[in-house]
């Protein structure tokens, strides 16, 4: 039974309701999150700026002593640097940048990569933010406060966007889980989907598929084996997706289509369902429907009943 992909008459209304549902959540959640993050990062930003007194440049040792400051240093350049852009300019592995920022980089990695990173930071330093550098005098308190305020805002935008994405995914998964538990389904923690029993679901489990002759894994956010299904059969695969604007959704719509094609090629009949919240337009829905992909809207969770649960 189709859930929504054949119900074209309601698509436009659903899009409006989905956008409104997302916007209500965003207005409630985002401002307080931004303020919380701002309070947490201000001290670290001030510490980084203290390394820019007078003619003293940021030296390589600052990352060895404080590797997690890299997240802040990336916001001190013109333009601010994304992780992958910094990795390319510094000729280092992208995972090394992440290692600095989350504090997991090894001592050898700090020593090897810090000079390359700091060379890029110094070359691209935003001198409009730090006009006192090479001026022959130290910064005034007003100059330091202005620089800190701008960097904090840049950093908070980056951190808030990531936090919002994570929170939206958590919220979507919670909505699905609450529905399933209300239907009497039980969470399992199998190693493979074949270990799921009828009436169980699993969170974040891979499904192996073939890509040509190569076997790859498709990550499933929620895998559900209906009570009427046979043990060991392919479960319903649910992927939670949210978007805060219409700009990027159509750039990624082929990803879902590719997953569906791989599932069909490997298993024949497969049920791949998207759990959509936020901004998904008619072009996106039409493309996915043409690929045989169905969806449940976050603002109408009870539609999951139509999955035969």
What does each model-found stretch correspond to?
Residues 1-149, 154-163, 170:
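Nuclease-adjacent, charged terminal/linker segments that flank catalytic cores
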Residues 2-4, 20, 28, 37-43, ...:
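Generic hydrophobic secondary-structure signal
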Residues 31, 35-38, 46-51, 116-122, ...:
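Generic detector of bulky aromatic hydrophobic side chains
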Residues 134-147, 180, 188-199, 227-231:
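Short low-complexity stretches enriched in small and charged residues
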Residues 155-209:
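Acidic-basic catalytic patches of nuclease active cores, encompassing PD-(D/E)XK
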Residues 190-309:
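Catalytic core segments in nucleotide and nucleic-acid processing enzymes
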């Amino acid at each position: 039974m189709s859930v929504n992909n054949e119900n074209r008459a309601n698509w436009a209304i659903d899009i409006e309701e989905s956008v409104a549902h997302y916007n209500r959540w965003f207005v409630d959640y985002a401002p307080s999150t931004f303020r919380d993050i701002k309070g947490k990062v201000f001290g670290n930003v001030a510490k980084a700026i203290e390394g820019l007194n007078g003619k003293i440049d940021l030296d390589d040792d600052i990352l060895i002593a404080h590797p997690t400051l890299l997240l802040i240093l990336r916001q001190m350049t013109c333009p601010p640097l994304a992780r992958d852009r910094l990795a390319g300019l510094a000729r280092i592995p992208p995972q090394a940048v992440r290692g600095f920022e989350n504090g997991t980089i090894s001592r050898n990695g700090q020593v090897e990569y810090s000079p390359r990173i700091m060379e890029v930071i110094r070359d691209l330093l935003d001198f409009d933010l730090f006009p006192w550098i090479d001026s022959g005098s130290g910064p005034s308190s007003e100059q330091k406060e202005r620089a800190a305020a701008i960097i904090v805002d840049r950093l908070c935008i980056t951190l808030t966007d990531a936090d919002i994405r994570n929170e939206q995914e958590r919220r979507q998964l919670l909505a699905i889980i609450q529905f399933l538990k209300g239907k009497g389904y039980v969470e399992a923690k199998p190693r493979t989907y074949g270990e799921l029993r009828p009436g169980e679901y699993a969170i974040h489990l891979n499904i192996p598929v073939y890509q040509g002759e190569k076997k790859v894994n498709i990550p499933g956010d929620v895998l559900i084996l209906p009570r009427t299904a046979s043990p060991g059969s392919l479960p319903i695969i649910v992927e939670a997706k949210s978007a805060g604007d219409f700009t990027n959704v159509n750039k990624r719509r082929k990803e879902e289509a590719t997953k569906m094609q791989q599932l069909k090629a490997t298993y024949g009949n497969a049920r791949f369902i998207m759990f959509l919240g936020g901004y998904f337009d008619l072009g996106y829905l039409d493309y996915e429907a043409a690929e045989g992909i169905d969806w449940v809207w976050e603002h109408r969770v009870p539609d999951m009943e139509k999955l035969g649960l």
